[in-house]
């Protein structure tokens, strides 16, 4: 595909990195010549220096014959204008835009539709991150929770702990422990390295285990890998920006929520907007404030300011003072690997959430959902099996007979309303939704090719 990426920031650059190795023709546009030079030195792509929404710049980038335009500059207005220009002047067929402002998002149904601003797919990072954190709170102890096929099946990452019934046992014992629940371990990472899960594989404490199950069975499977934690009740949020405010609004009906905001005017506004959240104006690094608000009784402390260092330090302080779990929002990708797994329980990257959403729209038509995992090194993919036995490499074939790319595991199949956990004898049928885990994202193009029907396939 010929894809134009507008914006060479962290998201634009990471998206280009993901797509360049998949036989795509990538052009990236930005007004920062140094950043463009840096990307061109690293990857096989074209660059255009200029303003992303200007017609002459888009023409130079090849909007007239591009398959897709992805607008991820730092300003919503530029992204919207670029989509409008690409549609009106160049008839670029697929247009994706990142929009952050809650004022635009509040009117998205009216603004982004046929006959209005021509954005085919809207990416709202703050909404994605809010939903992601909400899922983690719903499943105490989970490191990642990703849902597929309209929430019917989920891929969950947990850390195996001493005391979990399966820890120290082989994977084959999973069915003995849960005879009425079907699940599949898609991957195990031990000390950061992937292990191919087999029936004889012994689960060790501190293993990062990715399993696939019907969404209503997640808690049961988690209880086999770690001591099942009690549902969270008390939550403290630091930072009353878009994400913090949105998260508090979603949680306040079912949890006891406190929010700390440093800016007095913002705190005052939030106290009026939020019905059941207690809002404080103060510094989350203030030990006296945390002590007064009973930090030792908090189930989850979530730091969501715009400053990585503030989030990390306040979370470390909260953990030391007794908070049971701490989560932090991290903008810099390099920090995520450094902090998660120690004092910090979960590090959340808005860039990875955005990349996952973008890849879902950029992948070929048979790929309907993508989640970037393990800080972008791995991926979970939902693909639809199209074609028949004469045109497809997967339809009508048992999973054990399909030659999958290295490190690829089929975890589940969703057939209509039915969730089928994948086993070697499971046969894929036309229109099945197939959920896969890829230990290494470099094999994504091989998976795409596997699911593309071909009239020449015999």
Curated annotation (Swiss-Prot):
Its main location: membrane. NAD(+) 1 binds at residues 7-11, 30, 73-74, 98. The keyword Ion transport applies. It holds the Pfam family TrkA_N. Keywords: Cell inner membrane, Cell membrane, Ion transport, Membrane, NAD, Potassium, Potassium transport, Repeat, Transport. Residues 143-227, 368-453 form the RCK C-terminal domain. It comes from the Bacteria. It is a peripheral membrane protein. NAD(+) 2 binds at residues 234-262. Residues 1-123, 232-348 form the RCK N-terminal domain. The RCK N-terminal domain binds NAD and possibly other effectors. This is expected to cause a conformation change that regulates potassium transport. This is Trk system potassium uptake protein TrkA. The gene is trkA.
